A protein has these predicted regions:
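Conserved helicase/translocase P-loop NTPase motor core
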Residues: 89-93, 184-232, 242-248, 358, ...
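Coupling/hinge elements of helicase-like and P-loop NTPase modules
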Residues: 132-145, 161-167, 296-348, 365-371, ...
């Protein structure tokens, strides 16, 4: 390994990179260079320990993080690499199952369902479940989302259906008749859900982990193959693992336990997704010989910011690793700047707070800062509305960042509206939206005339279009509407024999929109074309995974996805190039840095939020995670605030609240 590269590391980083055999826990505070440590350790193992790249398994939590890690290693290696396994937990398990599924009686060509698809699946098979309380006669689908969340959490906790049933029967006296009946209904439903998916050759994302656990537990020879294959394991963001993922890591590590995990319990912000902070706290109990190395030199923030963040997170004691392991996690800034104190804006109402923030931003941009230097961080998307209004009134350009939802992009919503029109031509808003598209060349006055006619005649908007000759319109507008109606009828005739994607393609052709999309003139038009292409890619995937890909089924799936807040990601903008104030949630700010940061709306009930109760919680006795002594919801909210503070470069940080 290049000695100059090692010299660039600080002593703590160097010790982590050059650690020999056995388990290693690297506690990497914010801005301490954890990604550098992981990539340098991979290089060290290959060059100095003479490992083959294929003998190293590196796991993380997002495709983006896996891609960045892979790219760094690729660029750093003098001869490149082949067959290295750097991926997310789910991608790794999918790869294993595609190869080994037959060993546990599964079809290797299973289809993977997203959130909305699992909802559809459960609704379609709801009456195959022996449900009473959880399928009320008046509203049979009332508990569908709650059941799915319940099943997902059971998988996070590595609880099998048989284990659930056994627990209910063994505790019948303590539970009482009513509770025993409810829990037995849930346990049986969980069992039925798993059996139905196996019959239909489908899986949800939680199955990827649990099925690989099943494979390794029931086929020890296959587990040994993978243990021998991977001489070293590296796990990034270990604080985000759930119980099932932790068990997978433990099995793969085996007796040799050449395992490096990088974590920071103070940055555990995904409990709502099943992450178990106890995995970090209990690591040395599971691996008694583990070495612990703490990275405390911060290369991002000023000491002022780090001190305030540390002061905040102390309130989570004694449940923090620093207390449990009696170590020092206080971060020390490598920057030779003390930094400005955090400023506080206090107002009486939300609207006043938003106006004060907008005024402050105007002042900052008149000095040395540009709009793109500034970020407004909110706890949740729906907390941003007052601030967007205030920024607009002040003439301040802004962009709402984070993973943009494809189904909510205007150009994609137009196409979804057309599918909704075909599914139900009485859907007035859908018809209106489609006719508002520039490609049809109708004015607002034309649409208002049709709307007024429909209201007077007590008919649907589309029916009014069919009677365009009777509407007060000029001849040109009448011809356009007639042409539109003819196109819709042609496409309605195709509903029985064509998929939604194919009909939508005919719409692009017949409307003239396809020609416009392939002849874009601006960057914005190019992005619109890319988003529409992504929609068709997603429709193609849906068609491949479902026998019924009709307009009706596709509209139901998209509606469910939008209702659940799920969607494929749209193309992201070049954030640096856009000279606009950046508005984003704290969770979606991960990996981003801004010179000026506003933490807004810090008021009880919003940040910290009120605890979100699960509709159907798991019994505490079944939870395998060792729960903290304190209020774990409030601790998570503190960690979320700490997470954002400690990732701020800290030239200027402003906190506002009412």
């Amino acid at each position: 390994m290049n000695k100059n590269q090692l010299k660039k590391l600080n002593p703590q980083q160097r010790a982590a990179v050059r650690y020999g055999q056995g388990p290693l826990l690297v506690i990497a505070g914010a801005g301490t260079g954890k990604t550098t440590v992981i990539t340098e350790r991979i290089k060290y193992l290959i060059v100095s320990k003479k490992l083959k790249p294929a003998e190293i398994l590196a796991l993380t939590f997002t495709d983006k993080a896996a891609g960045e890690m892979e790219e760094r290693v690729d660029l750093a290696m003098p001869y490149g690499y082949t067959d290295m396994w750097i991926s997310t937990f789910h991608s790794f398990c999918d790869r294993v199952l595609r190869q080994e599924a037959l060993q546990i009686g599964l079809n290797a060509n299973y289809q993977l369902m997203g959130g909305a698809e699992t909802t559809q699946f459960l609704i379609n098979h709801l009456f195959k479940f022996k449900l009473g309380y959880y399928r009320p006669l008046g509203n049979p689908t009332q508990f569908v989302e709650g059941l799915l969340q319940h099943f997902s959490r059971l998988k996070d906790e590595d609880i099998q259906p048989s284990e659930y049933v056994h627990w209910v029967k063994a505790n019948s006296l303590q539970l009482g008749t009513d509770n025993q009946k409810k829990y037995l209904e849930l346990a049986t439903a969980y069992q039925t859900y798993e059996e139905l998916k196996t019959q239909k050759d489908v899986m949800d994302f939680g199955d990827l982990i649990t099925r690989v656990l099943q494979l390794f537990r029931t086929r020890p020879n296959i587990l040994r193959q993978y243990q021998q294959k991977f001489k070293y394991l590296l796990i990034d963001e270990f604080q985000d693992t759930n119980i099932a993922q932790n068990e997978l890591v433990r099995l793969l590590a085996g007796k040799q336990a050449n395992l490096t995990v990088v974590a920071d319990d103070d940055q555990a912000i995904y409990r709502w997704r099943g992450a178990a902070t106890a995995n970090v706290i209990q690591f040395r109990r599971n691996f008694p010989k583990a070495k612990l190395i703490t990275l405390t030199q911060n290369y991002r923030s000023t000491q002022e910011i780090l001190d305030r963040a540390y002061q905040l997170i102390q309130h989570n004691n004694p449940d923090r690793l620093e207390v449990k392991e009696k170590i020092n996690k206080k971060l020390v800034s490598a920057r030779q700047v003390v930094g400005q104190p955090i400023k506080l804006i206090l107002t009486g109402r939300l609207e006043d707070e938003a106006e004060a923030v907008a005024k402050k931003i105007s002042g900052l941009t008149k000095k040395k800062y540009q709009y793109q230097d500034i970020a407004l961080l909110v706890r949740a998307n729906n907390h941003a509305e007052a601030f967007t209004r205030a920024l607009s009134r002040a003439g301040i350009p802004y962009q709402f960042l984070g993973p943009g939802q494809l189904f909510r992009q205007p150009e994609v919503k137009d196409l979804i509206a057309y599918l909704k029109l075909l599914d139900n031509f009485e859907d007035g808003p859908a018809v209106y939206r489609v006719l508002s598209m520039g490609v049809f060349g109708l004015s607002g006055r034309d649409l208002a005339a049709i709307s007024n006619f429909a209201r007077r005649q007590n008919m649907a908007f589309f029916e009014a279009c069919e009677q365009a000759d009777q509407v007060f319109l000029n001849q040109e507008a009448r011809e356009k509407i007639k042409k539109f109606v003819q196109m819709v009828h042609r496409h309605l005739d195709l509903l029985v024999k064509e998929t939604a994607g194919q009909i939508l393609y005919y719409f692009l052709q017949d409307s003239g929109l396809l020609e416009q999309l392939t002849d874009y003139k601006t960057v914005a038009q190019e992005k619109q074309a890319q988003n529409i292409a992504k929609l068709f890619d997603r429709l193609k995937s849906y068609e491949a995974a479902h026998e019924d890909a009709s307009v009706q089924a596709t509209v139901a799936w998209i509606s469910l996805a939008m209702e659940r807040g799920e969607s494929p990601l749209a193309g992201t903008t070049d954030w640096v190039a856009e000279n606009k104030v950046n508005l984003l949630t704290i969770h979606s700010a991960k990996g981003l840095e801004f010179p000026v940061v506003f933490l807004v709306n810090l008021v009880s009930g919003r940040f910290p939020t009120r605890e979100r109760q699960e509709q159907i919680p798991i019994p505490d006795e079944l939870i395998k995670e060792i729960l903290p002594e304190g209020d774990y919801h409030l601790q998570e909210e503190r960690r979320l605030n700490f997470f954002r503070l400690s990732k701020t470069p800290g030239r200027k940080t402003i906190i506002s609240r009412q």
